[in-house]
Every structure is written in C-alpha cells, then in structure tokens.
Amino acid sequence: EQVFSGRSRVLGPDHRSTLTARDHLADTYWEAGRFDEAITLKKQILADAMRIMGPDSTGASAARLNLAATYRDAGRLNEAIALYKQNLDDVARTLGLDHPETLASRHSLAGAYRDAGRLDEAISLYQENLEEFTRLAGPDHPETLASRATLAGAYQAAGRLDEAIPLFEQNLDDIARTLGLDHPETLASRHSLAGAYRDTGRLDEAIALFEQNLTDFIRILGPDRPDTFTSRSTLASAYQAAGRLDEAIPLFEQNLKDRTRTLGPAHPVTLTSRNNLANAYLAAGRTEEAKKLFGTP
C-alpha cells in the first residue's frame, strides 16, 4: 500500500511504475482473500487501461480478465460472466475466431457458466472449443486432449454420462498412446474414466481401473506419496460401494495408518481417513470398532 501510494504521489497515477504497483497491491489483496479491496483496485486498473491504451488493447483485455476472475473467486458470478462475455466478443472481433486468445476466453466464460450452474451454456461453449482445437491443432494436441476432458467433465456434472464416458474413453486411449502408460496425465485420465463408470453404476469396470491406478502409483511414485494414498482411498470407496467390504476395510486401515505416520493424528486428512474407516466398520456391522474411531462411548 505504501509503495503504491508513494509512486502515485511522486510519479503520477498514470506512470507505468504506479500502474505496476497498483497491480501488485490488487494481487496481494486477492491472494489474501480481501476480494472487495482487490475488486475496487482492479476496476480502477481496467478503467485506466481502457483510457490509456484503448478498449481493444491487450492491456485492457488482460485487466478485464483479471477483474472477471476476481469476481468469480468472490462468488459474484453474474458480474464475472458479463465481463467474460464482453471479453470473448471483443477478442473474437479483433483477433479472429481461430486465435488462441479467443479459445482461452471462451473457456473462461464456459467455466463461469459452469460455476453458476448454467451447464447447458457451458457445454455449448466447451463443445465449440473442442471442435476448434481439433480442427486447428489436431486430435492429439495437448490442448485438444485437455478440451475433451473438460467437456467430458461438464457432461458428467450435468448427469449426461452416456455422452461423458465415450469422451473419457477416447482421452485415455489417446493420452496413453501419445504420452505413455506411466505419464501422470494417463493416470489422471484413467481416474476420470473410472469415476464416470462408478457414477453410472458400472462398478466392476470402475474398480478395475482404480486397481490399475493404485498399482501404478505405488510402482511409479512409491507407497508414501499423497497421490498413492488418494488412489488407495478411492479404490476402497469403490469396493465399499460394490458391497465388497472385506476388500475395502484393509485399504482404509492401511490408509489411516500411513496418514497418521506421515501427517500426524490430528491432520484434517488423517481425520477424514479415520472417518472413512469408521463408516466402513459400521457398514460391516463392526460397531464397537467404529465407535472407537468415532470417539463415542
């Protein structure tokens, strides 16, 4: 605050150093969760960028996106959406429909729609982006694969699993082929497909993929990595959902032991692991063991 105030007083409000200091102060407010103060500054930054550089300048576009993102983080989605829509219109008009900034702007607007529960509008934009990435970059480009995964996730969120699953399946095949079976993106893609299978009741198929992921995480990362713990917990939950408690409980027990050893008994993640195991005990009729974990008499 002192840096911004000093530069504004000595150099003037429109000096590049003053504008940079204001940017830094706004970002500091944003990182601290002081969204109202961040928004006030970012609105001023946008107004100045439009006045000094012009409404169609890259500086104005960047300032508009920063303000929209802050509105979004603050939960003021209607205001965020209005800015994202304006930015998409302006970028498409000035740079063209095929420009990377247009696709990025469309993605941001779609994400805000999704956050607001306007899934049909989000899906429409995600579909358009996937078509554009496939046409411009090719089906195997990382941006195309990421775009397909995003669209699949939106379908899943909307309950349109019959449309989500083929996209997740295609992505897993393509990522494994282009990046290799041991690549983190392959494991993430397999996890997404397994989750979609689980959500649609195809538990045996989900479990097979979750089992494969856990094996790979242990082999590639080791038994004590957070991703390994998460993978084990996910598999255990799938076993429990399928009524296979004899297989779920040992995994929950191992996870609680490992979380307690690596994070400590009072860590929130350890407490979640304890709760998961207690619920599995309860489902298996092992009430006394569940009570001990729940801390009830």
Please report, for each region that a protein language model flagged, where it lies by residue.
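Intrinsic-disorder-linked linear interaction elements in eukaryotic regulatory proteins
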Residues: 1-297
